[in-house]
Amino acid sequence: MEVGTQPKLSFKGVDILNVNFNAIAPFREDVSIVVACNPKVFYPKEENNIFKILMDVDVKDERYFVLNLRAIGHFELEGDIPADLTKNFVNVNAPAIMFPYVRSFITTLTANLGNTTGTLVIPPQFFKGDLEELPVE
């Protein structure tokens, strides 16, 4: 296997914008976690090579807890890139690059909640299809 870098896509980091946690009942071992991840893309005005992924993540077992999180990932495209490659970067690569940071945040947060949830390690997510594009304001 050959491993290389992708010089045309730069990841500039993730910011956690909002976290809402609600404990409903004492945690038990029979927790059945449901994860919903909804990424959207935003292209800032007058910055042709910049895009952002807004990711809403819900993790819950409605019997015990609900965790809602919103994060934003910052990305930059370098050079002349064909439209099909740009589309793949935006719709597949960027959310896949960003998600492990969000996942890690959730694990760290729940580890520090004590016995409220136990430490949650949510499964990896796979991204396919076109992201909803948020309007430029």
For each feature predicted by the language model, list its residue ranges.
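N-terminal intrinsically disordered, cationic/polar leader segments
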Residues: 1-97, 104-137
